[in-house]
Design a protein with these regions (language model features):
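Generic N-terminal amphipathic, Lys/Arg-enriched alpha-helix
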Residues: 1-5, 217
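Glycine-rich nucleotide/cofactor/substrate-binding loop typically near the N-terminus or early
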Residues: 71
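Alpha/beta enzyme core
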Residues: 7-9, 13-42, 46, 50-68, ...
Protein backbone atom coordinates (compact mmCIF):
# COMPACT_ATOMS: atom_id res chain seq x y z
CA UNK A 1 0.00 0.00 0.00
CA UNK A 2 2.89 2.37 0.76
CA UNK A 3 4.00 2.03 -2.86
CA UNK A 4 0.45 2.32 -4.25
CA UNK A 5 0.75 -1.15 -5.77
CA UNK A 6 -2.50 -2.99 -6.46
CA UNK A 7 -2.91 -6.67 -5.60
CA UNK A 8 -5.16 -9.49 -6.70
CA UNK A 9 -7.27 -12.03 -4.85
CA UNK A 10 -9.32 -15.02 -6.01
CA UNK A 11 -11.23 -17.71 -4.20
CA UNK A 12 -10.25 -21.37 -4.45
CA UNK A 13 -11.62 -24.48 -2.83
CA UNK A 14 -9.46 -27.31 -4.17
CA UNK A 15 -5.89 -28.12 -5.10
CA UNK A 16 -5.87 -27.91 -8.91
CA UNK A 17 -7.37 -24.44 -9.23
CA UNK A 18 -5.29 -23.26 -6.29
CA UNK A 19 -2.17 -24.39 -8.13
CA UNK A 20 -3.18 -22.60 -11.34
CA UNK A 21 -4.11 -19.42 -9.47
CA UNK A 22 -0.91 -19.38 -7.45
CA UNK A 23 1.39 -20.18 -10.36
CA UNK A 24 -0.13 -17.27 -12.31
CA UNK A 25 0.85 -14.75 -9.66
CA UNK A 26 -2.39 -14.08 -7.80
CA UNK A 27 -1.35 -12.52 -4.51
CA UNK A 28 -4.08 -13.82 -2.20
CA UNK A 29 -6.21 -16.96 -2.30
CA UNK A 30 -9.38 -16.85 -0.21
CA UNK A 31 -10.81 -20.16 0.93
CA UNK A 32 -14.23 -18.66 1.37
CA UNK A 33 -17.48 -19.85 2.86
CA UNK A 34 -18.84 -18.96 -0.58
CA UNK A 35 -18.08 -22.63 -1.19
CA UNK A 36 -21.49 -23.23 0.37
CA UNK A 37 -23.06 -21.67 -2.71
CA UNK A 38 -20.70 -22.41 -5.61
CA UNK A 39 -19.53 -25.87 -4.50
CA UNK A 40 -22.27 -27.26 -2.24
CA UNK A 41 -25.23 -25.65 -4.01
CA UNK A 42 -26.83 -23.91 -1.04
CA UNK A 43 -28.60 -20.56 -1.41
CA UNK A 44 -26.39 -18.93 1.23
CA UNK A 45 -23.08 -19.36 3.03
CA UNK A 46 -24.73 -20.19 6.36
CA UNK A 47 -24.63 -24.03 6.20
CA UNK A 48 -20.82 -24.19 5.86
CA UNK A 49 -19.14 -25.74 8.90
CA UNK A 50 -15.64 -25.39 10.31
CA UNK A 51 -14.79 -28.98 9.40
CA UNK A 52 -15.86 -28.38 5.80
CA UNK A 53 -13.90 -25.13 5.58
CA UNK A 54 -10.79 -26.82 6.96
CA UNK A 55 -11.11 -29.68 4.46
CA UNK A 56 -11.15 -27.24 1.54
CA UNK A 57 -8.39 -25.15 3.12
CA UNK A 58 -6.12 -28.18 3.31
CA UNK A 59 -6.83 -28.94 -0.36
CA UNK A 60 -5.87 -25.38 -1.33
CA UNK A 61 -2.72 -25.46 0.80
CA UNK A 62 -1.62 -28.60 -1.04
CA UNK A 63 -1.88 -26.81 -4.39
CA UNK A 64 -0.47 -23.46 -3.36
CA UNK A 65 3.00 -22.40 -4.46
CA UNK A 66 3.39 -18.97 -2.91
CA UNK A 67 0.12 -17.07 -2.60
CA UNK A 68 -1.06 -15.75 0.76
CA UNK A 69 -3.92 -17.98 1.91
CA UNK A 70 -6.82 -16.35 3.74
CA UNK A 71 -9.52 -18.51 5.29
CA UNK A 72 -13.07 -17.53 6.14
CA UNK A 73 -14.40 -18.16 9.61
CA UNK A 74 -17.86 -19.65 8.97
CA UNK A 75 -21.18 -18.51 10.39
CA UNK A 76 -21.24 -18.54 14.21
CA UNK A 77 -17.68 -19.89 14.44
CA UNK A 78 -16.63 -16.72 16.31
CA UNK A 79 -19.80 -16.02 18.28
CA UNK A 80 -17.71 -15.86 21.46
CA UNK A 81 -14.09 -14.87 21.93
CA UNK A 82 -13.07 -18.31 23.18
CA UNK A 83 -14.80 -20.07 20.29
CA UNK A 84 -13.29 -17.65 17.79
CA UNK A 85 -9.78 -18.13 19.14
CA UNK A 86 -10.09 -21.91 19.03
CA UNK A 87 -11.46 -21.95 15.48
CA UNK A 88 -8.90 -19.43 14.22
CA UNK A 89 -6.18 -21.63 15.72
CA UNK A 90 -7.55 -24.60 13.77
CA UNK A 91 -7.48 -22.63 10.52
CA UNK A 92 -3.92 -21.43 11.07
CA UNK A 93 -2.76 -24.94 11.96
CA UNK A 94 -4.38 -26.18 8.73
CA UNK A 95 -2.24 -23.78 6.70
CA UNK A 96 -4.00 -20.41 6.57
CA UNK A 97 -1.88 -17.26 6.68
CA UNK A 98 -4.78 -15.10 7.88
CA UNK A 99 -8.46 -15.39 8.77
CA UNK A 100 -11.48 -13.33 7.69
CA UNK A 101 -14.41 -12.39 9.92
CA UNK A 102 -17.59 -10.52 8.98
CA UNK A 103 -19.11 -7.58 10.81
CA UNK A 104 -18.71 -4.01 11.97
CA UNK A 105 -17.49 -2.55 15.22
CA UNK A 106 -18.99 -5.45 17.18
CA UNK A 107 -16.16 -7.72 15.95
CA UNK A 108 -13.49 -5.32 17.25
CA UNK A 109 -12.86 -7.39 20.38
CA UNK A 110 -12.49 -10.53 18.29
CA UNK A 111 -10.13 -8.78 15.88
CA UNK A 112 -8.01 -7.52 18.75
CA UNK A 113 -7.95 -10.89 20.50
CA UNK A 114 -6.77 -12.62 17.34
CA UNK A 115 -4.25 -9.92 16.47
CA UNK A 116 -2.81 -9.95 19.99
CA UNK A 117 -2.11 -13.66 19.53
CA UNK A 118 -0.34 -13.21 16.22
CA UNK A 119 -3.21 -14.16 13.92
CA UNK A 120 -3.65 -11.68 11.04
CA UNK A 121 -7.29 -10.68 10.61
CA UNK A 122 -9.21 -9.38 7.60
CA UNK A 123 -12.44 -7.63 8.58
CA UNK A 124 -15.27 -8.00 6.05
CA UNK A 125 -17.71 -5.06 5.88
CA UNK A 126 -20.50 -3.76 3.67
CA UNK A 127 -22.61 -6.59 2.33
CA UNK A 128 -21.86 -9.42 4.75
CA UNK A 129 -23.34 -12.73 3.51
CA UNK A 130 -23.49 -14.27 6.99
CA UNK A 131 -26.07 -11.63 7.96
CA UNK A 132 -28.11 -11.99 4.78
CA UNK A 133 -31.31 -12.73 6.73
CA UNK A 134 -30.98 -9.50 8.68
CA UNK A 135 -30.10 -7.20 5.77
CA UNK A 136 -32.77 -8.78 3.57
CA UNK A 137 -30.81 -9.89 0.52
CA UNK A 138 -27.94 -8.87 -1.71
CA UNK A 139 -28.36 -5.10 -1.53
CA UNK A 140 -25.84 -2.29 -1.80
CA UNK A 141 -24.72 -1.04 1.60
CA UNK A 142 -23.68 2.51 2.49
CA UNK A 143 -25.73 4.58 0.08
CA UNK A 144 -27.51 6.80 2.60
CA UNK A 145 -25.39 9.31 4.56
CA UNK A 146 -25.95 7.80 8.01
CA UNK A 147 -25.05 4.30 6.87
CA UNK A 148 -22.03 5.64 5.02
CA UNK A 149 -20.76 7.41 8.13
CA UNK A 150 -21.35 4.28 10.21
CA UNK A 151 -19.30 2.12 7.85
CA UNK A 152 -16.43 4.63 7.81
CA UNK A 153 -16.35 4.88 11.60
CA UNK A 154 -16.50 1.12 12.02
CA UNK A 155 -13.68 0.61 9.51
CA UNK A 156 -11.51 3.01 11.50
CA UNK A 157 -12.41 1.21 14.73
CA UNK A 158 -11.49 -2.17 13.26
CA UNK A 159 -8.12 -0.88 12.09
CA UNK A 160 -7.46 0.45 15.59
CA UNK A 161 -8.47 -2.93 17.02
CA UNK A 162 -5.74 -4.62 15.02
CA UNK A 163 -7.31 -5.73 11.74
CA UNK A 164 -4.55 -6.28 9.19
CA UNK A 165 -6.82 -5.95 6.15
CA UNK A 166 -10.33 -4.82 5.29
CA UNK A 167 -12.65 -6.28 2.66
CA UNK A 168 -15.47 -4.06 1.39
CA UNK A 169 -18.30 -5.83 -0.43
CA UNK A 170 -20.94 -4.13 -2.55
CA UNK A 171 -20.57 -0.53 -1.40
CA UNK A 172 -20.52 2.62 -3.57
CA UNK A 173 -17.20 3.38 -5.19
CA UNK A 174 -16.87 6.78 -3.56
CA UNK A 175 -17.28 5.24 -0.11
CA UNK A 176 -14.69 2.57 -0.84
CA UNK A 177 -12.32 5.23 -2.14
CA UNK A 178 -12.71 7.31 1.02
CA UNK A 179 -12.12 4.35 3.31
CA UNK A 180 -9.12 3.20 1.29
CA UNK A 181 -7.50 6.62 1.52
CA UNK A 182 -8.31 6.93 5.23
CA UNK A 183 -6.95 3.59 6.45
CA UNK A 184 -3.32 2.56 6.65
CA UNK A 185 -4.15 -1.13 6.18
CA UNK A 186 -4.84 -2.63 2.73
CA UNK A 187 -8.45 -2.54 1.53
CA UNK A 188 -9.82 -5.23 -0.79
CA UNK A 189 -12.90 -4.54 -2.87
CA UNK A 190 -15.61 -6.70 -4.44
CA UNK A 191 -18.27 -4.68 -6.19
CA UNK A 192 -16.77 -1.60 -4.58
CA UNK A 193 -15.21 0.32 -7.44
CA UNK A 194 -11.67 0.57 -8.75
CA UNK A 195 -10.02 2.61 -6.01
CA UNK A 196 -9.38 -0.08 -3.40
CA UNK A 197 -5.88 -1.46 -2.89
CA UNK A 198 -6.89 -4.90 -4.13
CA UNK A 199 -9.72 -6.65 -5.96
CA UNK A 200 -11.27 -10.03 -5.23
CA UNK A 201 -13.56 -12.29 -7.25
CA UNK A 202 -15.14 -15.67 -6.75
CA UNK A 203 -13.25 -17.84 -9.22
CA UNK A 204 -16.45 -19.42 -10.56
CA UNK A 205 -17.73 -15.96 -11.52
CA UNK A 206 -14.42 -15.09 -13.19
CA UNK A 207 -14.55 -18.28 -15.25
CA UNK A 208 -18.24 -17.79 -16.09
CA UNK A 209 -19.25 -21.15 -14.63
CA UNK A 210 -21.38 -19.99 -11.71
CA UNK A 211 -24.89 -21.45 -11.72
CA UNK A 212 -26.21 -18.91 -9.25
CA UNK A 213 -29.02 -16.51 -10.13
CA UNK A 214 -27.03 -13.86 -8.29
CA UNK A 215 -23.31 -14.46 -8.84
CA UNK A 216 -21.21 -13.74 -5.75
CA UNK A 217 -21.86 -11.07 -6.80
CA UNK A 218 -21.48 -9.20 -10.12
CA UNK A 219 -18.28 -7.71 -9.53
CA UNK A 220 -16.20 -6.79 -12.46
CA UNK A 221 -15.84 -3.15 -11.50
CA UNK A 222 -18.40 -1.15 -9.57
CA UNK A 223 -21.64 -3.09 -9.26
CA UNK A 224 -22.70 -0.90 -6.37
CA UNK A 225 -22.86 2.17 -8.58
CA UNK A 226 -24.79 0.52 -11.40
Amino acid sequence: KKNSEKFTCLTAYESTLASVISENGVDVILVGDSLGMVVQGHDSTLPVTMDQLIYHLECVVNGNSGSHIMADMPFMSYSTDDLGLENAKRLMQAGANSVKIEGGEWISNMAQALSDRGIPVCAHMGLTPQTINRIGGHHVQGRDPSQKEKIINEAIALEKAGAAMLLLECVPGDLAKEITSTLKIPVIGIGAGIHTDGQIMVVHDLLGISCLDTPCLLYTSDAADE
